[in-house]
Amino acid sequence: MFKKKGDIMRIILTILAFFAFNVNADGHASDESKDNAYMLLSTYEIAPGQNPADLEKELAQLQLDQESYGFNDCGLYRHWYGGQRAFYAYCFFTDFDQFEAIRIKSDADDDRMAITQNYSGHTDHILHVQKANLKEAPTNLLWMKWEFGPYLTVAEKQERADKLFDAFNRSFGACNLYFHSWGPEIAHYIDCGFENFSDFGKKHDAINKILAEELATAKLDILDHSDDLLILIQD
């Protein structure tokens, strides 16, 4: 489901060279959007004692700048409930030729670095868009990370991610599926939208019914998982 600078600066960008897995476990090509094949996801942690509104204003402008550099579409979410009190900035792009053109234009912008860093920590991920069923950015977003056992092959991890994605996609009506391409961790990500907490409650019941009836005895080999509820600031 997303420039930079606080007292404790901890910019983490550990690049893991890992080939982009562009097929599903059954061997068929994944149905990612032709135009939005990749998503740059950047998280910006809210520093202790900071007014989040200041960082929000800075990042909202950053995302407008990112679009002016050539990204297909950019937006911004804010932490609502979950583990990391942060902003989530996303930008979609088609391929790495476009990404290079964006870098050149961004580097030529002298104003880009003339800002004060207002966040405490930052990460970047480049994710491959495997399934794209969300047609617009939801106002309220469920963002999930799924890591599977290291003893599994890439195809086996994909098979488990597809099972979970199918369950959430049916429960929420429309979701997206992403896979690690470059960044700090090898994981799959699923995001789904909901209107409000009454709607979320209905979808909560729906996913738990599927989990109980279809996946309760499934061997999913989940190593790590996180849920975050986010609210849209700008699309």
Which residue stretches match the model-derived regions?
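Short S/T/G/P-rich N-terminal loop/turn motif that feeds into the first structured element of a domain
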Residues: 25-235
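Generic detector of N-terminal low-structure segments
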Residues: 4, 20-23
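Sec-dependent N-terminal signal peptides
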Residues: 11-21
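Short, Lys/Arg-enriched N-terminal segments with co-localized hydrophobic residues
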Residues: 1-8
